[in-house]
Amino acid sequence: MIRLSLFISLLLTSVAVLADVQINIRGNVYIPPCTINNGQNIVVDFGNINPEHVDNSRGEVTKNISISCPYKSGSLWIKVTGNTMGVGQNNVLATNITHFGIALYQGKGMSTPLTLGNGSGNGYRVTAGLDTARSTFTFTSVPFRNGSGILNGGDFRTTASMSMIYN
């Protein structure tokens, strides 16, 4: 009988020491970036440019690039990062030639600057140049002269990185 009482007492005591524990659940809702131009580099070739024609409004090259976005909810954002020319226009990439850069615009034409930089982290909202039916984005590149500085002849180059994401 003493053993039975002791067993029941131990059983009741062990029930009394049970306590609630917290369950922590964590994760990350990951929005995958878009694949741009099938993962291939984008080449913008201006060929030969007459320095007298570099007036920030002529000689544009328009590119249509494919975009494949596995997640399409919200607005499309674009981030283009590279060396800016620092001329008060935040859409001009610097080149290796003094006073010469390449201005970028969303869409065809020069009405919507393609702002360079991180913006809000995802870049800047796409407001022109998006064709969702064809899954393409169009941008325009324009030779840019900073002020009235003399442009020396020679090969020029610049690079930038582009990413796009819906958010």
Curated annotation (Swiss-Prot):
Pfam families: Fimbrial. GO terms for cellular component: extracellular region; pilus. Residues 1-18 form the signal peptide. It is found in: Secreted; Fimbrium. Its main location: secreted. The keyword Secreted applies. Keywords: Cell adhesion, Fimbrium, Secreted, Signal. One of its GO terms (biological process) is cell adhesion involved in single-species biofilm formation. Gene3D superfamilies: Fimbrial-type adhesion domain. It comes from the Bacteria. Fimbriae (also called pili), polar filaments radiating from the surface of the bacterium to a length of 0.5-1.5 micrometers and numbering 100-300 per cell, enable bacteria to colonize the epithelium of specific host organs. This is Minor fimbrial protein PrsF. It comes from Escherichia coli.
